[in-house]
């Protein structure tokens, strides 16, 4: 179908890409998450990949997509600063769901980065953005290239933050199709899916964390805080992977 010609869509300006995909996004909004995944696998170009931060609700998209494509490469960008509980969660889900896990890291180790640049996350928005570029964006770009990705699944939800509030199910990002099957799910739907499928939240959920990233830029939720304020000292919501 011409509307899913990735090369042709990549040649368009961003606003024209959005317009070209508007009709199909309207149709996708009417489907269930499972139906959306089926549609993507049938209509969008491979190779398919799924990214996961192994955060609070990570089990959902991992389970949802691997039920239909068990061997899909699962991309984790490991900064080296994840919580011990996150690494344990990764191991547990990889075993439980038999994930085809691909771990990507920055070219420079965490210790080497600190010796060269200091603690970038303590250097304001500019430092955080450089840190994210080194540890998230570049490794993800490398993963998409090495895995020859044509379609990238991710587990973002509109309810998570204002920056995600207008995201469509289907878009173009980093030169590939970006597909968000649970974009319209609320917290109740998340809970129900986890319960019905014998899946767990991230271990730190029970300790008051609403969102989990690196140890140095993640805070427990406290009364009066938004979920966005628990990450990057409230200066940013996105780590760079889902921007652009």
From Swiss-Prot:
Keywords linked to the UniProt accession: Cytoplasm, Oxidoreductase
One Gene Ontology cellular component: cytoplasm
Main location: cytoplasm
Active-site residues (renumbered): 239
EC number(s) from the headed UniProt entry: 1.8.4.8
GO molecular function: phosphoadenylyl-sulfate reductase (thioredoxin) activity
Biological or metabolic pathway of the protein: Sulfur metabolism; hydrogen sulfide biosynthesis; sulfite from sulfate: step 3/3
One BP term from GO: hydrogen sulfide biosynthetic process
Location of the protein in the cell: Cytoplasm
Role according to the record: Catalyzes the formation of sulfite from phosphoadenosine 5'-phosphosulfate (PAPS) using thioredoxin as an electron donor.
Protein name, UniProt field: Phosphoadenosine 5'-phosphosulfate reductase
Species for this entry: Pectobacterium atrosepticum (strain SCRI 1043 / ATCC BAA-672) (Erwinia carotovora subsp. atroseptica)
Gene (name only): cysH
């Amino acid at each position: 179908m011409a509307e899913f010609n990735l090369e042709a869509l990549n040649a368009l300006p961003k606003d024209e890409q959005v317009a070209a995909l508007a009709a199909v996004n309207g149709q996708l909004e009417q489907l269930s998450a499972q139906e959306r995944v089926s549609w993507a696998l049938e209509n969008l170009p491979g190779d398919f990949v799924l990214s996961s931060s192994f955060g609070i609700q990570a089990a959902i998209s991992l389970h949802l997509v691997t039920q239909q494509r068990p061997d899909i490469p699962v991309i984790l960008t490991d900064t080296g600063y994840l919580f011990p509980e996150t690494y344990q969660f990764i191991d547990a889900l990889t075993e439980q769901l038999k994930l085809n896990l691909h771990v990507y890291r920055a070219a420079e180790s965490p210790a080497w980065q600190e010796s060269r640049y200091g603690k970038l996350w303590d250097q304001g928005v500019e430092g955080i953005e450089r840190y994210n570029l080194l540890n998230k964006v570049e490794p993800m770009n490398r993963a998409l290239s090495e895995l020859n990705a044509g379609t990238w699944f991710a587990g973002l939800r509109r309810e998570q933050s204002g920056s995600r509030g207008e995201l469509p199910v289907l878009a173009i990002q980093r030169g590939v199709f970006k597909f968000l099957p649970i974009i319209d799910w609320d917290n109740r739907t998340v809970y129900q899916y986890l319960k019905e499928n014998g899946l767990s939240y991230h271990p730190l959920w029970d300790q008051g964390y609403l969102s989990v990233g690196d140890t140095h830029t993640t805070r427990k939720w406290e009364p009066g805080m938004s979920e966005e304020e628990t990450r990057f000292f409230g200066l940013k919501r996105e780590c760079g992977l889902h921007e652009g």
